């Protein structure tokens, strides 16, 4: 009878809704006369029913979330607020993610909304996987929503045992070589090889190895084995804080000759005096040092 009357939707909802608002009977009545979920929600909201009560009623009535979410969005809440409301009404995080995505919310916005609703990372990842994202897109969303390379690596390595492939996807998604190296850890030669495989620059490789815990004395040998130029090895060790004497010693032990060390030093703005002292400290033969400095292009101070 009310449906056939000329009353507004809100007026009908007010008549059907008891006080304090308990909209379950109203939901049944309004649905029986063919109202869509969006119309029911708008009417009950206008009648003063709180959203949490309405949504709990919808959930109990097995309302399809794909229809409820657009109605909720049309009501004006933010994605974060809507996610909290839907989760509070006992819908699962995966269902909420799919509903928000179905309402044209971008995957990263879906992730932010779920995070704001305190969805834990394992459940968040499962929810994003329910959106049928590729592994690359999933990692990009996690990167863009503030998750570190270490936690992404930890969470995804079980599903992608190919370390090189997962590392490549991390780099493609915006993670830096140092962050990736810290996440991977593992044996130093294997880590160095992975960094080269994912196309980290030579200096990036050296710095990343050092930041990931590889002793500086090993880095020169690892970089040489990868085919890195002497100047890049000096630069990486210098950026890691190694003094010239330590750099020269590491390079001598990695079978670089005096000419290589001197040239690497000059190309990285180490003075002739510093280079000479460093090479002497590293026990290069004294008679080789002047010739090596000359080979590297250092000017002699002798008249």
Identify the function of each model-found stretch.
Residues 1-303:
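General marker for long, soluble alpha-helical cores
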